[in-house]
Amino acid sequence: MPLLDGPRNGETVTASAHNGIPIIDGVDPSTLRGDIDQDPNRRQKIVVVGLGMVAVAFIEKLVKLDSERRKYDIVVIGEEPHIAYNRVGLSSYFEHRKIEDLYLNPKEWYGSFKDRSFDYYLNTRVTDVFPQHKTVKTSTGDIVSYDILVLATGSDAVLPTSTPGHDAKGIFVYRTISDLERLMEFAANHKGQTGVTVGGGLLGLEAAKAMTDLEDFGSVKLIDRNKWVLARQLDGDAGSLVTKKIRDLGLEVLHEKRVAKIHTDDDNNVTGILFEDGQELDCCCICFAIGIRPRDELGGSTGIQCAKRGGFVIDESLRTSVNDIYAIGECASWENQTFGIIAPGIEMADVLSFNLTNPDKEPKRFNRPDLSTKLKLLGVDVASFGDFFADRDGPKFLPGQRPSAESIGAADPNREEEPQVKALTYRDPFGGVYKKYLFTMDGKYLLGGMMIGDTKDYVKLNQMVKSQKPLEVPPSEFILGAQSGGEENADDLDDSTQICSCHNVTKGDVVESVKSGTCKTIADVKSCTKAGTGCGGCMPLVQSIFNKTMLDMGQEVSNNLCVHIPYSRADLYNVIAIRQLRTFDDVMKSAGKCPDSLGCEICKPAIASILSSLFNPHLMDKEYHELQETNDRFLANIQRNGTFSVVPRVPGGEITADKLIAIGQVAKKYNLYCKITGGQRIDMFGARKQDLLDIWTELVDAGMESGHAYAKSLRTVKSCVGTTWCRFGVGDSVGMAIRLEQRYKSIRAPHKFKGAVSGCVRECAEAQNKDFGLIATEKGFNIFVGGNGGAKPRHSELLAKDVPPEEVIPILDRYVIFYIRTADKLQRTARWLESLPGGIEYLKDVVLNDKLGIAAEMERQMQELVDSYFCEWTETVRNPKRRKYFQQFANTDETVENVEIVKEREQVRPTYWPKDGANEDFKGHQWSSLSWQPVIKADYFSDGPPAISSANIKRGDTQLAIFKVKGKYYATQQMCPHKRTFVLSDGLIGDDDNGKYWVSCPYHKRNFELNGEQAGRCQNDEAMNIATFPVEEREDGWIYMKLPPVEELDSVLGTEKWKVKKGEAVDPFEAYDKKYSGMKGKRAGAKGIEGSKPTRSPSNTIDW
């Protein structure tokens, strides 16, 4: 078995290799070899020390090249507790905090090898190597034999141990996940203070970005001993431009500073820095990113030669000074150089894997590596390629000749040499672009260069340097051509061009993976070739090559909605509109690939949205209800514990006291958590499904309507008070906001959209980050469109100026309808506007100038939608037939709590989700016995259409989901293991061409198969599965399930066992509350603090 967590305490852990070669604990290594070499048929064992990016690259390449001969078994020993992760993308960890997102391969990959040919240790260090016995010893005491040993131990971050205070609390390095987690924990406890990064190289800028992304420090400063950042890659002009761009982003950079001493307090906490020039800087945290030191400690006693500057000495075949021991990556010293970037390590892995698997062929040689880099650092595009310092240091090589000693200025220091290189430089101070290309004196050869701000020609130019071919165009065209726009294009690149330097992937590799049929999607290409899985900077080119290759093969690069619909969302909208298709079945018969397909979790909501945008049916009507996502299905947003939120509409944020009181009475009666939203209305959380009808009955009776907080439709139109109250107001923002919200409420779109109206340029309503926003002027309103907040914020753009109030509606009608007609699935207006050819100018032509001649038609369509408005909740509460949809269980009126509720700040909320889900093998569980048991009457389920209906039933303490799909029944557990949520019966059902059905969890779209040999398997997360049960309808009118005894069923799937309870998850504020406990104000405010009291009780109040 592969070891995922290393050895457990008190146990001897072994990892068996093929043919019985053991890993033995506590045995004299001299006795280990024994008769191992006497078996001529055995596979050789390669032991890899280290499990980093280079080690994994070597293993992947070796396995691929050895797939036919099967000559080798592999054991890899990793020192970190994690499987191999992407160290190049380390800074992204601060954004998602998920180590799994950095894994180079999923955990399943490590267990996918046949014949036990691959084993691995984690959290285990190799402490000794015994070359004479061909064994290594680990930190757990295990002795591991090898035939070939590959050292891929990497490097350590350098810490200035000679600097006083280097061991203080608050000193960090930037190298591993553990380093980042310690830094994150420290930063969280020192909010608002100053953090410092020391080092202005590649790693230093990454560390500075990481500290900035934490958002805990009040300020972050970058300390660099050089005159400009990236001094090893850039000249002074380029480095100074990068420094300026970084400063413009708010990061303070201090150049020509060397740390002399680190100041500390009596508890050895960092308090500041003393520089060698006598200046001082106050700070609480210092992250050193000043270089790396090769991990070569295994060299000393083993006889493996190490270089003076560190690293195992290797030759051009990657051999060390000891037979059958090789070194690759940052721990290897080639010609007294070590390399701290990934590309040379990948090249080493390529050379060694080829030579080990092709002994009969001419061996590959490791030559001077390409140290070119292309990165995005702190939002700045930076690239250097080829011999980028040839003008400063003299050329390392001149095409067609070898430079003499004189030519590189080494023969006679007193002789004034003629230059061997000419530089062509381009500067654009307005666009922040700098380019310097270095040519031979005759301009026939490109030697190298550097780029800032615009790096799209990097791959093409780097290949020109590598090819050493005479140029076909004059040097001037490199600059003139660079000024033209356009995306990265791979059409004119040779197949030998390296596209991905992180993993040494060429254009030909990508092309071949597609042409061979191995890769049919861009995700397949990334998985197969590893292109784009390092720093990710090559992805535009990889996408371009993939698209071009697919087109060359006659394959269309699809933007189809999904596998069931051969149209884009915009095309499908037009098909449905022109053919007047009014149901899902009509759409599938007219526009689907298979007329009787069930669709899937992608096309069903998209088609439902289009039907609503065109015809506005009630979502709970029989033919539409099954198409809806869970939110639309129950007209409310589902929350973490399976309850829902209730949001009445508050147009423009204006509400009467009576309606506020009604909301308060409802919230108190049903014990709902209340919160004011960013859209100026009140959200009530924690409503049980079975209470939604009663809650909305009371709200409707109080004169309120659905706020559509659950829908991909208009949410709110926010407003400031404008001229209604404000002394600075220029226009009536409240009046306009209410009119707009009342006009566009309930209208479905490809995604949610929001509006705002500000009464003057002070912009209190934040209209310029909304899908549409208005700002009052003396002449009317300026209309802005295409903005949003969210994960990728975007300021809106000005569509029209000084529009009179009566002319606002036609403009917005056209804008919204054009968006509904042409946007892609789940595309916000910001991304839609960016994708329009010509952007805002094109939109102006369509909306304002009627370029397409459809303005009147779009206004008419909007008016029809506005006239068709009805409140969905008002209609629902008046229809008693819909009550059955709002039961928790279909077979009983009982109710259960799915997540433990806690009280906080005088309100209730569900306890936090734990980090891990329920990863037990429910699918493979062996029940002691199964018997047929009646569970629910068959008439609960629809005979169709629609072709699908479902129910959640309760058996003992266990919740079970039953699905009726095209007349057949399927049954599973109700709990989705991912977050232990009891919701599967509310999930959308999908199918494929092979008749395979799946249910998609409403929360995070884990898809579980319902039928076939793999029933219960999760299609998109192999770490989890669900239990399935036989189920059938019988002549007595009941549905029967084949179930184990109730007690046994509850012991495996019971709600009480799996519902999330308080204490399972880490309290995010535990450290904060511990640190700041007891800090209370001296006046009124918090409960329990004596404060001012009203002089008299207000009348006509409710009991809050």
From Swiss-Prot:
[4Fe-4S] cluster binds at C720, C726, C760, C764. Siroheme binds at C764. GO terms for biological process: anaerobic respiration; nitrate assimilation. Residues 396-419, 1081-1104 are annotated as: Disordered. Pathway: Nitrogen metabolism; nitrate reduction (assimilation). Its EC number is 1.7.1.4. It is an enzyme of class 1 (oxidoreductase). Its cofactor is siroheme; [4Fe-4S] cluster; FAD; [2Fe-2S] cluster. One of its GO terms (molecular function) is heme binding. [2Fe-2S] cluster 1 binds at C500, C502, C535, C538. Residues 1094-1104 have a biased composition (Polar residues). Gene3D superfamilies: BFD-like [2Fe-2S]-binding domain, FAD/NAD(P)-binding domain, Rieske [2Fe-2S] iron-sulphur domain, Sulfite Reductase Hemoprotein, domain 1. It catalyses: NH4(+) + 3 NADP(+) + 2 H2O = nitrite + 3 NADPH + 5 H(+); NH4(+) + 3 NAD(+) + 2 H2O = nitrite + 3 NADH + 5 H(+). Belongs to the nitrite and sulfite reductase 4Fe-4S domain family. Homodimer. This is Nitrite reductase [NAD(P)H]. The gene is niiA.
